[in-house]
Amino acid sequence: MLKKIIIGIVLVLVLIQFIPLDKSNPKVDESISLHTDENIMKILKKSCYDCHSNETKWSIYSKIAPLSFKIHSNVKIGRAALNFSNWKDIKQDIKIARLKRAIKTVNNKMMPLSAYLSLHEEARMSSDERKILVKWLENELRLIAPDEVYF
């Protein structure tokens, strides 16, 4: 009986490898993507772009189910929440809300996700990088909505 269960589990794990997931990156239109200070871009690309842009670097383990399902879902959710590749196309009221949320999540060390950091230690932000990024996010917020109270 135990042998049949193990064979069944192995069979399921093999079969789910054939479930297709779109791991391509949509084309990046440079005219609408984020362009800002080089230091900010360096932090964003290191710590945020895999989930929050159309420039995801799909790792080898992102092709292995069931882990691939979770990674694909996280990228899809991340892009929907805030996509730096579509920065200039985001409506102002939505951008304000997303900037506020980004400030909160970066300040509270909720981003990058701990599961992501466990596999990508290089994406971890130093406290200085976190402060620099939050300051930039706050400045972006002030630029697009100077009369609004944020914090």
For the regions a protein language model found, what residue spans apply to each?
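Post-cleavage N-terminal segment of exported redox proteins
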Residues: 1-34, 137-151
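Sequence context of c-type cytochrome heme-c attachment sites
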Residues: 13, 24-35, 84-89, 114-119
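Sequence/structural segment immediately N-terminal to covalent heme-attachment motifs in c-type
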Residues: 35-49, 71
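Soluble non-cytosolic domains of exported or imported proteins
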Residues: 38, 42, 93, 123-128
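The canonical Cys-X-X-Cys-His
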Residues: 44-55, 111, 133
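Short cysteine/histidine-rich zinc-coordinating motifs and their immediately flanking basic loops
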Residues: 60-66
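Extracytoplasmic electron-transfer domains, predominantly the class I c-type cytochrome c fold
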Residues: 69-119
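C-terminal capping alpha-helices of c-type cytochrome domains
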Residues: 109-110, 117, 121-148
